[in-house]
Every structure is written in C-alpha cells, then in structure tokens.
Amino acid sequence: MFNGIIYKTGQITKVVSNKNYSEIVLKTNFKFKKSEIGSSLCCNGTCLTVTRIHNNLISFYLSKETLKRTNFSSVKIGDIINIEKSLKYGTKISGHYVQGHVDTTAIISKIIVLNKSWIIIFKISKTYKKLLIEKGSISINGVSLTISKIQKNTFQISIIPHTLKLTNLIKL
C-alpha cells in the first residue's frame, strides 16, 4: 500500500523484453539492503516486487498482465519513473491510498499550461470512466491527484509546480 506522494524518481538503465514478460532495472538514490529483495515498490503507480539489488540498481519482473494494463510496455532506457516505498504502519498519509493494482491507462487529450501549473485532460474508455468521481482521487504515474472535472469521455486533473518538479509528470 502506498499514498501517491512522490519524493524520488529512478531512471531505467536496462529493459529485457519478450512477448510474455519484461525485466527492468532502475537506478535510484533510494538506499536498499539485500534483505529488501521481495519487498514492494510503487513504480509509476504499479506495485512491483524488487527481485535484485546491486548498489543503487534495483530490478523488477513485469508479467504479461502488468505490461497489458500499465505504461511499462512502452518504457525505454533513460525514462524516468516515479518511485515510492510502501507505507509503514503509523506513518503520515498525505495523498490517498494507492494499491498499485492498475486497471488501465488513459490518453492525454490536451495539456493547458497556466503560469507554472498544468491542467491535463485525459481520454478514458466508458468502462473505466464510470469508476471516476469528480473531486475524487486518482493515481497518474503513481502520483495522488484530484479529479477536477469529468465530461463525456474525458477527465481533468490539475498539477501544481511542486508536483511537476518532484515527479515525471513534467515529461508527459
């Protein structure tokens, strides 16, 4: 379980793919111990299991289902990934509960830049639109955000400069 507040990012240094699975390696400045192999890390909103640790490099195995439902099928070396360690009992929750079980992706329809903030309008299928609530929470690339508007086949979120600075959303 995570809360969608991103303080760290990682950079993809290796991608090994075939039609049934992929493995990725991230370079990060999070400190990991070998004992953390098997622990969960939220990567772009997806709960992934750490399979290998070597210095500041961490590896993950991505199943066919994960590749189908997330944006990991299109990642490449050099891409920046939002990362968040799992919540610990008793710690502050600043965003909303993010399980890391991704249902689908959305397509950016429009980005409106207002001074240093952004409004992003996403297209989403009817199947998933019915799950959205205006002023409800949504996780985009693992970032806890509020849905500011829902229309026919779109929803809208607003992003403040602080969030753009700390996350990979600036790369959308």
Locate predicted features:
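Conserved loop->alpha-helix
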Residues: 1-172
